[in-house]
Regions:
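Rossmann-like dinucleotide-binding domain for NAD(H)/NADP(H)
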Residues: 90, 94, 224, 233-322
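Rossmann-like adenosine-cofactor binding region
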Residues: 57-60, 181-276
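Phosphate-binding beta-alpha-beta segment of Rossmann-like dinucleotide-binding domains, i.e.
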Residues: 98-152, 164-167
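Short, Asp-centered acidic motifs that coordinate Mg2+ and/or phosphate
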Residues: 47-48, 71, 207, 235, ...
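Glycine-rich, N-terminal phosphate-binding loop of Rossmann-like dinucleotide-binding domains
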Residues: 9, 52-53, 76, 210-212, ...
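An N-terminal-biased, well-structured beta-alpha scaffold segment characteristic
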Residues: 1-95, 223, 228
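N-terminal Rossmann-fold cofactor-binding loop
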Residues: 9, 178-182
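Glycine-rich Rossmann-fold phosphate-binding loop(s) that bind the pyrophosphate
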Residues: 158-159
């Protein structure tokens, strides 16, 4: 008898085809989200679950499991929506999909740097609202932003994505400085300058890009105390996790022009982000699309499926969390 697998949302066609061949699978072809209660009730009938960040797999979720579920193949790098300690206590394996989305997230990071610097959101709205013609063409003011060439980019979290962002930024002749738990080896560091203390790095940055996982240590790492150290002309970029930012502190800094701008792809309480962000002209926002390329989403789906296959073949998981 084939193991039963539940897929909570629509994933890439190629991955779904493999699941249909090798497992007794229930797909979500219409991509209609299950309610929290529906998912708890349904998953008790399955041996494996392929989940996404939209699924709330908290302690209560695991407390209501009846012993059949053996593995969760999560489609995504971050897994802060999964109570991994409860999974471990229930002897349920959890995997994620790291590394396959590094390039895509790095690209979005550079996009946010450029969009925030060159006021792309404001310029786009000017054209779409058909009000461009109503503005006097003052070449010193109309949609004038900042160049990024030759500026200093500070990277918080110099892991794989942070390193790729640094490589992309070097094409703009940007100077790279970084704060990380540990100093990188010379071959990985390249020409970047290491700061063992975040507070000493920030005053030297024109741009600050955050690339840390969501942990208790990184929760609200961007707060009012830290934002005071940003230069007034600086831009903050976040493509990591919304929980790393104190929304009130960042919004206050943007409202009062304490920093030049922000480019954000992630938020607290997604998709119900703080509406004040939408009122800020100096904040360029995206709906968490860092990994949203055909190539990356296929790779993420395939890795999640490969982890499921490994588990039921009694092989080590390719990217085990717990």
């Amino acid at each position: 008898m084939k193991p039963k697998i539940l897929v909570s949302r629509k994933i890439s066609d190629g991955a779904e085809e493999i699941l249909k061949k090798e497992f007794d699978v229930t797909l979500n072809l219409e991509d209609k989200p299950y309610t929290y209660e529906e998912l708890i009730k349904l998953v008790n009938e399955y041996d494996g679950l392929i989940s996404t960040s939209f699924d709330k797999l908290d302690k209560n979720f695991f407390d209501n499991l009846k012993g059949k579920l053996k593995i969760i193949g999560h489609v995504g790098v971050g897994y802060d929506n999964i109570h991994t300690q409860s999974a471990k206590e229930k002897n349920i394996k959890v995997s994620n999909t790291p590394n396959v989305l590094n390039d895509a997230v790095a690209e979005i990071t550079i996009l946010l740097i450029l969009a925030s610097s060159r006021r792309v959101g404001e310029a786009y709205n000017l054209v779409k609202s058909n009000t461009w013609k109503d503005h006097r063409p003052d070449i010193t003011k109309l949609m004038v932003g900042n160049e990024i060439t030759g500026k200093t980019l500070g990277i918080i979290g110099m892991g794989r994505i942070g390193q790729i962002v640094a490589d992309r930024a070097r094409a703009f002749k940007m100077k790279i400085v970084y704060y990380n738990r540990n100093k990188l080896s010379n071959d990985l560091e390249k020409d970047a300058t290491y700061y063992p203390d975040l507070k000493s790095m920030l005053p030297n940055c024109d741009y600050v890009s955050l690339h840390t996982p969501a942990t208790s240590e990184t929760k609200n790492i961007i707060n009012s105390e830290i934002l005071k150290l940003f230069p007034k002309h600086s831009v903050f970029i976040n493509t990591s996790r919304g929980s790393t930012v104190d929304d009130n502190a960042l919004i206050e800094a943007l409202q009062n022009k304490k920093i030049y701008g922000a480019g954000l792809d992630v938020f607290n309480n997604e998709p119900n982000l703080d509406k004040r962000y939408l009122e800020l002209e100096n904040c360029f926002v995206l709906p968490h699309v860092g990994s949203a390329t055909h190539e990356t989403r296929l790779a993420m789906s395939m890795l999640a499926v490969d982890n499921i296959k490994c588990f039921f073949s009694q092989k080590p998981l390719l990217s085990e969390v717990v």
